[in-house]
Amino acid sequence: MKNKNSEQNTHSTIGEQDIHYFHEGKHIYAYEFMGAHKACEEGIEGIRFTTWAPNAKSICVIGDFNYWQVEDKNYMEPITDAGLWSVFIPNAKNGDKYKFVVTNKDTNHYVYKSDPYAFFSELRPNTASIITTETQYTWSDDKWLEKRAKTNYYDNPMNVYELHLASWKTKNGKFLTYDELSETLPQYIKEMGYTHVEFMPLHEHPLDASWGYQPTGFYSVNSRHGDIIGLKRLVDKLHNNDIGVILDWVPGHFCKDQHGLIYFDGSPCYEYQEPTKAINKGWGTHNFDLGRNEVKCFLISNAMYWINEFHIDGLRVDAVSNILYLNYDREDGQWIPNIYGGHENLEGIAFLKELNGVLKHTCKGVITIAEESSSWPDISTPVEKGGLGFDFKWNMGWMNDTLRYISLDPVYRKYHHNLITFSMVYHYSEKFILSISHDEVVHGKKSLINKMWGDLWNKYAGLRLYMSYMIGHPGKKLIFMGSEFVQFVEWREYEQLQWQVVDQYESHKQTLHFFKKLNDFYHNETALWQCDYNHHGFRWIDADNSQQSILSFIRSSKDNKQKLIFICNFTPVTYYDYHLGVPDAGSYKEVFNSDNLEFGGSGQVMATEIFSSLQSSHGFEQRITIKIPPMATLVLKLIK
C-alpha cells in the first residue's frame, strides 16, 4: 500500500498489494488507483478507469472519447472476484466527460452512474464525471504545515468562522470562484481575528438547498466555484495568512439521486443490505454500510484525499449520532438491534475509531471534530483509552440552553438560572467547542440577533453580552458567518449575506468592530484558551446569583500569572457599588467592557483602577466594589 503525502499519482499500475488492502478494508489511499487516472500502457497514452461493483454483470465506460456510445472495447474487465473492474481507454484524455453503464448480474437492468472516485464533475443539473489529471500545484505553506504538526490545539486559541461559500458573497448574483474568494476571504478572516475557517461541505452535491450535506461526488470538488487548482490556491492563501482550514465532512450517508452511489451496481452496494439500516427517511438519503471493507476504504481514503491533496487541517464530522445509533431518528419497530440486543451501531463505532486512529497515525496536527448531540461518552477520548478518538466535540447542550436563556425576558431569567451555569457541570467530560452554527439561524429559528430579548438596543446589548460571555466560557469557539455584523434575516443559502447593512447603519458597523475587538482580546489573553480543558483554568466567583442574573468567574493561565475576572449581567439594570470577591489583593483594571460606547453601548465603563480591600466575599478574603453596566460583560485584570 502506498503512503504518500502530496499530489496524485500519474501512473495506473494496480498492484496485488493495493487490491489486497482494498478488499481487506485497510487501504487509505484508494483514490490513487480507483477512478480515472492517466496511464501509458504498451507505449500508448490514455486513461485507466477502475471501479468497484460486486454485483455487476458488466460495466462500460462511455463519454466524449467514444461519442457516448456503448462499445465492446470500452467494457471493463473484472480484476478480482470481489467486484473490482478496470479498463484502459487509449483516446480518453483530461477534460473528457464520462459515465459508467453498470448492468446488474441478477436483473440485467442497467444504470448510468457517475464515477464514485471522480475528482471533478459537471455543474448541476448535469451529472457526468470529468477526467481530471492536471491537478499538480506548487504549495507555499510549508511553514504552516510544520507549525501545525507541532501544535497542541488544546492549549492554543481556536476561534472558528463557519462559512458557506455560495452565500458568503456573490458577484452579480453568481457564485464567486475559488480564485475570487482568495482575493478577499483570507484577508477578511485575518482582520477579524479568527484562527480558522470551517467550510461547509465542498464535495459535489446536486441540490443547492442541501448545503452540501447530501453529496454525490465525495472526491469531486464543488464545481460551482471553479476547479481543483482554484481550491488549492484558496487553502494555500489561507495558510499563508495563518488561518487553519476545517472541512465539514459527511461519512454517514449519501444522496439518493440515481446517478450517484445509490444501488451503484443495481443492488445495495455502498449502502447497507438491510433496508431498515440503509434508508434514512428523515433526510431522504441512504446510510453507508460502515461494516463493508470496500466502503470503509472509500470513506477513509476520502478523508485522506482532502487532507493530503488540499492540505485540510481538520474534519468536522457531520451527524455522528446517525453513525452511532441504530435507532437514530427511528421509531420502535423501524430498527433492528445489534447482536447484543442494543441500539448501538457496532460497525459505526468501529469505523469512527478506525478513522480517527488512521488520521492520528498518518496526519500530524490534523484534528477531527464530532457534531454529536447525545450523551454518548468519551467521544473526545483517545481510541487507546477506550474513546472514539475525536479531538473535539460540539457542545450542543450549551448552545441549546444558553440560546433559550438569552431569549427570555430578564424578569424571568432568575427562574432559569441553571440554563446559563449547567454547562460547567459536565464541561470536563469532553473537549468541547462552543458552537453557534448555521443550524441555529435557519428554518424559523431566527437570526442570532433576533433570538435576543427586547427592543433594538437590548438586542444589540444582549448579543454583545452573550458573545463576550461565550469568549469567557471554557472551550474553543465557533460562530456562523453573518452574525458578526448582525444579519437580521435568517441565513438564506440562495443569496449573499446582507453586507450592505454595515455601510448603511452605524449599529451594524459598531457590532462588526465589537467582534473584531473581542476576537483580538481572546487571542491576546492566554487565560482564555490555555487551560480550556483543565480545572485550573476556570473558577466560579458566584454561580448562584439568580436573583440579579449575574455570573462571575475567573479564567487563569497555566502559570497563574494571568487571571481575568468576568462579570456578566443578564439584566438591563446598572448595579452600583457591587461587592465582588477576588482571589488576589491588589489593583484591578477593566480590560474589556461590552457596554463600551465604541460598540454601541451606554458607555458605563470604569476608567480608573479598582483596589481590593481586606473584606471577605464569595469565599475570598479580598473584595472589590464595582459598577456593573446593563446587559453587559465586564472583564477585569489584576495589574499589580
From Swiss-Prot:
Catalytic activity: Transfers a segment of a (1->4)-alpha-D-glucan chain to a primary hydroxy group in a similar glucan chain
Entry GO MF terms: 1,4-alpha-glucan branching enzyme activity; cation binding; hydrolase activity, hydrolyzing O-glycosyl compounds
Keyword Transferase: yes
GO CC aspect terms: cytosol
Domain of life: Bacteria
Pathway, per record: Glycan biosynthesis; glycogen biosynthesis
Catalytic class of the enzyme: transferase
UniProt entry tagged with the keyword Glycosyltransferase: yes
SUPFAM superfamilies from the UniProt entry: (Trans)glycosidases, E set domains, Glycosyl hydrolase domain
EC number: 2.4.1.18
Entry's Gene Ontology BP terms: glycogen biosynthetic process
Active site: 318 (nucleophile), 371 (proton donor)
Keywords associated with the record: Carbohydrate metabolism, Glycogen biosynthesis, Glycogen metabolism, Glycosyltransferase, Transferase
Function as written in the Swiss-Prot or TrEMBL entry: Catalyzes the formation of the alpha-1,6-glucosidic linkages in glycogen by scission of a 1,4-alpha-linked oligosaccharide from growing alpha-1,4-glucan chains and the subsequent attachment of the oligosaccharide to the alpha-1,6 position.
HAMAP family registered for this protein in UniProt: GlgB (MF_00685)
Stated family: Belongs to the glycosyl hydrolase 13 family. GlgB subfamily.
Record text on subunit structure and interactions: Monomer.
PANTHER family named in the record: 1,4-ALPHA-GLUCAN-BRANCHING ENZYME (PTHR43651:SF3)
Name recorded for this polypeptide: 1,4-alpha-glucan branching enzyme GlgB
Gene field: glgB
